[in-house]
Curated annotation (Swiss-Prot):
InterPro entries: SAICAR_synt/ADE2_N, SAICAR_synth. HAMAP family: SAICAR_synth (MF_00137). This is Phosphoribosylaminoimidazole-succinocarboxamide synthase. It comes from the Bacteria. Keywords: ATP-binding, Ligase, Nucleotide-binding, Purine biosynthesis. PANTHER family: PHOSPHORIBOSYLAMINOIMIDAZOLE-SUCCINOCARBOXAMIDE SYNTHASE. Pfam families: SAICAR_synt. Belongs to the SAICAR synthetase family. One of its GO terms (molecular function) is ATP binding. It is an enzyme of class 6 (ligase). Pathway: Purine metabolism; IMP biosynthesis via de novo pathway; 5-amino-1-(5-phospho-D-ribosyl)imidazole-4-carboxamide from 5-amino-1-(5-phospho-D-ribosyl)imidazole-4-carboxylate: step 1/2. It catalyses: 5-amino-1-(5-phospho-D-ribosyl)imidazole-4-carboxylate + L-aspartate + ATP = (2S)-2-[5-amino-1-(5-phospho-beta-D-ribosyl)imidazole-4-carboxamido]succinate + ADP + phosphate + 2 H(+). The keyword Flavoprotein does not apply. It comes from Citrifermentans bemidjiense (strain ATCC BAA-1014 / DSM 16622 / JCM 12645 / Bem) (Geobacter bemidjiensis).
Length: 296
């Protein structure tokens, strides 16, 4: 099995942040985002990485960013390492395929979730209240049902190791401003509807997904990642059957395994068997091939 990239360390480059998955380097006016093979579940980073996961996430993000350029600009300057600043070139072998050279935008203080199907925390909220983020939904929905129309459900941005919290659109307006929040909502729904239709043609249901936006030169742009298996629920269309959880092309396979363990869902993470690592990697790679027609 290929050795996963768990951490990066590039002498001469300034490490600005190390998130659950990405290492971000400050290049002055721009940023270098390196997507590692780290994987987290229940907000805990696992000890093992998933080989090629960083490559898969980067390539899927780049694919969707290109597809959505008619709706909104994105933060990418280039994903081709030969275009990167000269101080990055000594590390080209590690960076190739798993990194983006991006504009330095000011992130909005909310994460923007769109749901086309009812699942996960949305399903739990609906069972309790008949609504998600204050949006009333029809009675009688089953788990994994397609919603009558997609809904925009923002959340707070949590610190590493803590959980995001769903908020109402009105609360987002108070945090970010009404004008920008309205634009973000409209753009998010437009992106989702276009992506949902494109993915459907390739046998994938995008049940829900999460976006981040920023302001660059006074303009709203989309940043971070775009509709990857880490930020979305991807279901195989061929086996879709409402009324319960769905198989998926993401880390749900890992979550399901962890649910079988006597583990409190706090660090330290339990060790992962090689089979779980391998099968999780296969799920990610299958999503890349189905969406883009290309593997490694």
């Amino acid at each position: 099995m290929t050795t996963p990239v768990l951490n990066t360390d590039f002498p001469g480059l300034k490490l600005a942040a190390r998130g659950k998955v990405r290492d971000i380097y400050d290049l002055g006016e721009t940023l270098l985002i390196v997507t590692t093979d780290r994987i987290s579940a229940f907000d805990v980073i696992m000890n093992e990485g998933i080989p090629h996961k960083g490559y898969v996430l980067t390539q899927i993000s780049a694919y969707w960013f290109r597809q959505m350029e008619d709706i909104i600009k994105n933060h990418i300057i280039s994903t081709d390492v030969t275009d990167f600043p000269k101080e990055c070139q000594p590390y080209a072998d590690v960076l190739a395929g798993r990194s983006m050279w991006v504009k330095k935008a000011k992130p909005l203080a909310a994460e923007c979730i769109v749901r086309g199907y009812i699942s996960g925390s949305g399903w739990k909220d609906y069972q309790k209240t008949g609504a998600i983020c204050g949006i009333k939904l029809p009675e009688g929905l089953k788990e994994s049902d397609r919603l009558p129309q997609p809904i925009f459900t923002p959340s707070t941005k949590a610190e590493l190791g803590t959980h995001d919290e769903n908020i109402s659109f009105e609360e987002m307006c108070r945090i970010c401003g009404t004008e920008i929040s309205t634009k973000v909502r409209d753009v998010t729904l437009a992106i989702y509807e276009k992506a949902r239709d494109l993915a459907d043609q390739k046998g994938i249901i995008i049940a829900d997904t999460k976006f981040e936006y920023g302001i660059y030169d006074g303009e709203l742009i989309i940043i971070d990642e775009c509709m990857t298996p880490d930020s979305s629920r991807f279901w195989p269309k061929e086996s879709y059957k409402p009324g319960g959880p769905q198989p998926s092309f993401d880390k749900q396979f890992l979550r399901d395994y962890l649910e079988t363990l006597d583990w409190g869902k706090t660090a330290p993470a339990p060790p992962l068997p090689e089979e779980i690592v391998r099968k999780t990697g296969e799920k990610y790679m299958e999503a890349l091939v189905k969406l883009t027609g290309k593997g490694i």
